[in-house]
């Protein structure tokens, strides 16, 4: 309802602050242009509770990325204040933020996902790893400090860099096309195929503007149905709600591997979720409207 007061939460203090500011501005501009009573609030600092109590919004559009928007604290706060919001619950956010916990749940349910374990000093020293592998923080997003590692020397460097962001995981490397699917509650949108600027879809590839996106992805009808069903099942198994995105690798044997679930995806007009929606004829403003109207 357009007579409701909406707060767009963006910014914050995570390493993904700059990306979040862009998402928040795009969403806020869209809501205002559509006639919504919307204001933006930078979640940086310690004044968020006071700002929300002062504004008394009916709904919050969560455009925070990284720990600020995806570790469950913002969801818990909004739920405590009885404010409807566009992201997953506190419990689901905690699960999806931790890639290892997410992976363990998916593997328990026999969902296709690459094998992984925590990387430690001892494991680095053992030198018994079959390369290539992926090394990344177990929490975080935007592929910050994520590496494709091909040797023990590269492993040591990757471990050192990734450990700056907390616990580190090492994951089986899967070669194939990078595919993603956006979901808003029961609405599963078209898959998008990403051709990254670099060897894989790392931070630079995501924000340089030089990667190529195919939306729709060009999958045959059967494979499109399969990837959408896998995305929705993963979304449901991890307890997601609202807007989320599921990332896959599609190998040359026709197998999909679930890489991760993002509970607060980017929301600029060039972000992946809007591209997923646009492939089905849903423009950016309409997509923003669908997300906010379904806030829970």
From Swiss-Prot:
PROSITE patterns: ATP_GRASP, DALA_DALA_LIGASE_1, DALA_DALA_LIGASE_2. It holds the Pfam family Dala_Dala_lig_C. Residues 103-293 form the ATP-grasp domain. ATP binds at residues 129-180. Binds 2 magnesium or manganese ions per subunit. The keyword RNA-binding does not apply. Mg(2+) 1 binds at residues 247, 260. Gene3D superfamilies: 3.40.50.20, ATP-grasp fold, A domain, ATP-grasp fold, B domain. GO terms for molecular function: ATP binding; D-alanine-D-alanine ligase activity; metal ion binding. GO terms for biological process: cell wall organization; peptidoglycan biosynthetic process; regulation of cell shape. Mg(2+) 2 binds at residues 260, 262. GO terms for cellular component: cytoplasm. Keywords: ATP-binding, Cell shape, Cell wall biogenesis/degradation, Cytoplasm, Ligase, Magnesium, Manganese, Metal-binding, Nucleotide-binding, Peptidoglycan synthesis. The keyword rRNA processing does not apply. Pathway: Cell wall biogenesis; peptidoglycan biosynthesis. It is found in: Cytoplasm. It catalyses: 2 D-alanine + ATP = D-alanyl-D-alanine + ADP + phosphate + H(+). Its EC number is 6.3.2.4. Belongs to the D-alanine--D-alanine ligase family. HAMAP family: Dala_Dala_lig. Cell wall formation. This is D-alanine--D-alanine ligase. It comes from Francisella tularensis subsp. novicida (strain U112). The gene is ddl.
């Amino acid at each position: 309802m357009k007579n409701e007061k909406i707060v767009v939460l963006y910014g914050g203090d995570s390493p993904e602050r700059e990306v979040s500011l862009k998402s928040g501005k795009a969403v806020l501009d869209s809501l205002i242009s559509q006639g919504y009573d919307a204001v933006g609030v930078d979640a940086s600092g310690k004044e968020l509770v006071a700002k929300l109590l002062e504004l008394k919004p009916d709904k919050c559009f969560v455009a925070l990325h990284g720990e600020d928007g995806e570790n469950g604290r913002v969801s818990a706060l909004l739920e405590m204040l009885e404010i409807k919001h566009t992201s997953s619950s506190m419990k689901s956010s905690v699960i999806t933020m931790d890639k290892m916990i997410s992976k363990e749940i998916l593997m328990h349910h026999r969902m296709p996902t690459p094998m992984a374990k925590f990387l430690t000093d001892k494991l680095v020293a053992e030198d018994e790893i079959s390369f290539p592998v992926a090394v990344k923080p177990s929490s975080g997003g935007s592929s910050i400090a994520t590496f494709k590692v091909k040797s023990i020397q590269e492993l040591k460097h990757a471990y050192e860099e990734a450990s700056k962001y907390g616990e580190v995981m090492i994951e089986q490397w899967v070669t194939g096309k990078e595919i993603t699917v956006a979901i808003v509650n029961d609405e599963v949108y078209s898959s998008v195929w990403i051709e990254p600027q670099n060897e894989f879809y790392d931070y630079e590839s995501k924000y340089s503007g030089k990667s190529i996106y195919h939306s729709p992805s060009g999958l045959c009808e059967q494979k499109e149905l399969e990837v959408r069903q896998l995305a929705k099942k993963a979304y449901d198994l991890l307890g997601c709600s609202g807007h989320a995105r599921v990332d896959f690798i599609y190998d040359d044997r026709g197998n999909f591997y679930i890489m991760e679930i993002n509970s607060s995806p980017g929301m600029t007009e060039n972000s992946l979720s809007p591209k997923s929606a646009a492939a089905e004829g849903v423009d950016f403003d309409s997509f923003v409207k669908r997300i906010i109207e379904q806030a829970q």
